[in-house]
């Protein structure tokens, strides 16, 4: 009998809760995800393996009808997909009538309003590995096999499925020039390690070039060869020379046996046997790589020994030698936008994947991260944003191209008849930041089914509803006149402190906005920029960044984010901001016009931050608010602590604050008596914060740490904003009852506990806003604060209203730093920080077209766009020749 399963009427949700005591101890499970106990306990959502078992069972066969199909071969279309025995048996275009009267017994899934995409294929993953990913003792570890350490109980598998990932290549780390053999896994939850292994997948092996195998950042004494790039080249020379000789030895032996002789067989060497497999083509090389010089070296070395590199992994400078990679025939698998975390990553550009594709290279986006793999659709979408890549080509970078790189292009990676039914149902376009996976199917069986632990699915939570409903511009916008006016006319204006204004106008005079509305009268001498079809937004404010203090992660000489010596309240970042930092222009291109540049380490009292704009030639030109906040990293308190006593470092903080207050009393008394002030710059700097006269950024992440930080702030009578609060969702009501604001981040990160809901970090902002907590959002990404809009977009996708998400990175961020009167919204009288885009500010596919800071239009070029232009010209020059 035919069964119908209508996704539009049956929402797959499970609400659950767990009691979270003052000491983060599980005391009691209460019904209702948001119940509040009468005693001193709080409840919060959780997940168990039992909850993760899908309720939808297909038996490997189903019909998914009237769904928007993204085949990864052509633009999306409305149609129906039939699955039988775990395989796709039919893909038809056009709307279908109800199949409820059919008689073949297949489960019917109504996909109306939904999107069906191929499962994501991550060609570079370390998920599901037990006991570490590296074997660092030797330079060559080809005898090792990652399949020996597969962990089927790694919760990362389930969370990857929640992001639509169906296949991964499980790789060793990059400690070895020639590492161990890899394994391709089909992700399933609740199965054995053997059941994860992709049957008959080609054998791969991990190579590595550059800083990692030569141990540049290992620290301590390095005595393992090689320690240079020329040494790595020698490893390949020597290893494959020996492998050739090994093969010749066995060939001679086999020939002698064939002639009836009884020779002594050569000594079997698993390591050399694997290398011989590379030479013979049965083992495929996937090589970690960064710099163009080492990439070329490996290609030439492979050609010298007669084999082909299957994929260059990471390949951050691949765009520099794109033509050579294409000629060799290697595929490339890169990050979407990671850069600068070490010196060999400093020339990475977000156009890399697209430029390699343009050269004819089989190009993919990989994760190398349990978090990044959860949104690889969106990572691929960034190539649309930064390089104008076609959307189908972008989708292929997360699906079909990866299948081909793994030698599985005829079995997975696209929605085609005959391929495995590895499918993902989403409620929006897979490249959209606003899409959520509804279920993930592997071999025709549902392996992930979306839970809704927080009751937020398609919610529209806001802590400022009046801003979303009040009238936009005044009925009769004020007329403006005068020379030097600039008007942006005809675009959709998103003011942040009110609803959007279609066909709106923003007028700038000097550094200020002088009018915003839908019918502003303009004088004849006003300069006009046509914004028709475009969107105008307030410039975003990136809170708690190292912008200007940090250049390259692995190079200490470029890092001024932290200081030694414990508590340093008088230290300010202001004069250390480097105006020529490449990060400034790279960050600006996402629509970020201001940052709060903050100390990032040391402490617990780390020092004072400053607010800077991202357009200036000296630190004095950049800084717009000096010493805006004092940053304190509240000492961590374990969630399973046995008592609520202050840790020793908290007691020390209390003592220091009291010392600062005493210093102020004594200094005031001295002044009253005509005496010289007491000379202590540390206490002088700390006193206004200790007395609640200035605001403190109190960093606290874990639930118990948050509770301790709030008690500390309350008892010390401090003016604080909580920063981080990654487990704020566990204690949202407590934060609300304290009346505190929070800066949430990172949003794009994995939950701390295996039993936290898979979406707890994504939904954190919405849970807090629902409780009435004023929120701002930060990226918490030293290398990529430019990804702030995507963090806000994810928060919006997981329950926060779009208006509230916009305010979280504009107006609320301005409120945090005390600059809401001049920044954070497109409002007459405020500074003219304006961003023009071709679409939704938070979408990964949206392009930022133009920007103004203080009324001055700023360049949209940066170090990365310059490199892109330079090497794109090289590519086309090579093609022309």
Predicted regions and their residues:
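C-terminal cap of metal-dependent C-N hydrolases
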Residues: 67, 79, 416-459, 489, ...
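Bacterial N-terminal signal peptides that target proteins for export
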Residues: 4-22
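N-terminal pre-domain segments of enzymes
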Residues: 38-59, 458-482
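Polyanionic/metal-chelating signatures
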Residues: 161-309, 432, 436-437, 442-452, ...
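His/Asp/Glu-enriched, well-ordered alpha-helical/loop segment
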Residues: 53, 131-133, 139-144, 284, ...
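Bacterial N-terminal signal peptides
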Residues: 20-31
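Histidine-rich, glycine-flanked metal-binding segment
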Residues: 46-60, 69, 73-117, 497-539
């Amino acid at each position: 009998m035919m069964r119908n399963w209508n996704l539009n009427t049956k929402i797959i949700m499970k609400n659950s809760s767990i009691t979270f005591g003052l000491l983060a101890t599980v005391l009691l499970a209460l019904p209702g995800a948001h119940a509040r106990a009468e005693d001193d306990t709080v409840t919060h959502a959780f997940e168990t393996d039992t909850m993760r078992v899908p309720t939808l069972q297909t038996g490997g066969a189903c019909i998914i009808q009237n769904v928007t199909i993204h085949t990864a071969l052509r633009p999306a279309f409305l149609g129906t997909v039939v699955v039988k025995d775990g395989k796709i048996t039919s893909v038809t275009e056009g709307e279908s009538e109800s199949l409820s009267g059919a008689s073949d017994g297949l489960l019917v899934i109504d996909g109306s309003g939904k999107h069906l995409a191929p499962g994501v294929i991550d060609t570079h993953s370390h998920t599901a590995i037990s006991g570490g990913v590296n074997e660092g003792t030797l330079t060559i570890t080809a005898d090792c096999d990652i399949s020996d350490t597969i962990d089927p109980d790694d919760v990362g598998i389930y969370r990857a499925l929640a992001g639509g990932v169906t296949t991964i290549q499980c790789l060793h780390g990059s400690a070895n020039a020639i590492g161990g053999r890899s394994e391709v896994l089909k992700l399933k939850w609740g199965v054995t390690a053997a059941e994860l292994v992709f049957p008959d997948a080609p054998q791969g092996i991990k190579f590595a070039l550059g800083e990692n195998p030569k141990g540049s950042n290992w620290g301590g004494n390095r005595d393992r060869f090689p320690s240079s790039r020329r040494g790595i080249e020698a490893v390949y020379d020597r290893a494959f020379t020996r492998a050739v000789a090994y093969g010749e030895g066995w060939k001679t032996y086999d020939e002698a046996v064939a002639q009836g002789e009884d020779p002594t067989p050569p000594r079997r060497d698993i390591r050399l046997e694997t290398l011989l497999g590379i030479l013979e083509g049965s083992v495929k090389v996937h090589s970690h790589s960064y710099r163009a010089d080492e990439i070329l070296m490996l290609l030439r070395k492979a050609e010298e020994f007669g084999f082909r590199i299957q994929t260059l992994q990471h390949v951050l400078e691949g765009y520099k030698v794109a033509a050579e990679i294409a000629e060799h025939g290697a595929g490339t698998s890169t990050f979407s936008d990671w850069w600068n975390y070490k010196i060999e990553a400093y020339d990475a550009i977000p156009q890399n994947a697209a430029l390699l594709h343009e050269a004819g290279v089989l190009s993919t986006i990989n994760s190398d991260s349990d978090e990044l793999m959860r949104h690889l659709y969106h990572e691929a979408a960034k190539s649309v944003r930064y390089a104008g890549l076609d959307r189908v080509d972008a989708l292929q970078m997360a699906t079909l191209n990866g299948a081909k790189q793994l030698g599985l292009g005829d079995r997975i990676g696209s929605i085609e008849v005959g391929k495995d039914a590895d499918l993902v149902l989403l409620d929006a376009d897979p490249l959209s930041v606003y899409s959520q996976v509804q279920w993930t199917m592997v071999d025709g069986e549902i392996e992930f089914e979306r839970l809704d632990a927080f009751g937020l699915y398609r919610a529209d939570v806001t802590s400022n509803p009046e801003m979303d409903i009040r009238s936009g511009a005044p009925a009769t916008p004020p007329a403006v006149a005068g020379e030097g006016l600039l008007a942006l006319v005809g675009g959709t204006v998103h003011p942040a402190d009110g609803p959007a204004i279609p066909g709106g106008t923003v007028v700038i005079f000097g550094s200020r906005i002088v009018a915003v509305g839908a019918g502003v009268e303009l004088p004849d001498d006003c300069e006009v920029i046509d914004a028709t079809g475009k969107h105008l937004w307030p410039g975003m404010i990136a809170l708690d960044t190292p912008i200007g203090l940090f250049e390259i992660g692995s190079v200490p000489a470029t890092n001024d984010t932290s200081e030694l010596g414990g508590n340093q309240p008088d230290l300010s970042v202001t004069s250390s901001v480097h105006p020529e930092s490449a990060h400034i222009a790279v960050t600006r291109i996402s629509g970020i016009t201001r940052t709060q540049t903050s100390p990032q380490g040391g402490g617990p009292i780390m020092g004072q931050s400053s607010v800077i704009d991202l357009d200036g030639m000296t630190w004095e030109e950049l800084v717009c608010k000096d010493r805006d906040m004092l940053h304190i990293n509240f000492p961590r308190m374990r969630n399973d602590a046995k008592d609520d006593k202050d840790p020793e470092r908290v007691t020390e903080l209390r003592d220091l604050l009291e010392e600062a207050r005493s210093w102020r009393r004594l200094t005031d008394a001295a002044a009253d008596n005509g005496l010289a002030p007491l000379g202590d710059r540390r206490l002088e700097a700390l006193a206004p914060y200790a007395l609640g006269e200035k605001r403190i950024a109190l960093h606290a992440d874990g639930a118990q740490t948050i509770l301790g930080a709030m008690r500390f702030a309350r008892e010390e009578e401090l003016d604080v904003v909580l920063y981080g609060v990654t487990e704020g969702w566990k204690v949202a009501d407590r934060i609300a009852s304290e009346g505190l604001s929070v800066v949430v981040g990172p949003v794009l990160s994995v939950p701390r506990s295996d039993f936290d809901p898979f979406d707890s970090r994504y939904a954190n902002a919405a849970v807090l806003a629902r409780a009435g907590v004023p929120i701002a959002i930060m990226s918490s990404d030293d290398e990529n604060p430019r990804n702030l809009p995507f963090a806000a977009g994810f928060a919006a996708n997981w329950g926060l209203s779009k208006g509230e998400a916009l305010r979280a990175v504009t107006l609320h961020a301005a409120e945090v730093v005390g600059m809401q009167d001049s920044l954070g919204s497109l409002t007459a009288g405020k500074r003219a920080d304006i961003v023009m885009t071709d679409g939704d500010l938070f979408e990964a596919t949206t392009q930022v077209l133009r920007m103004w800071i203080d009324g001055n239009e700023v360049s949209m070029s940066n170090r990365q766009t310059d490199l892109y232009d330079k090497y794109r010209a090289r590519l086309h020059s090579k093609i022309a020749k």
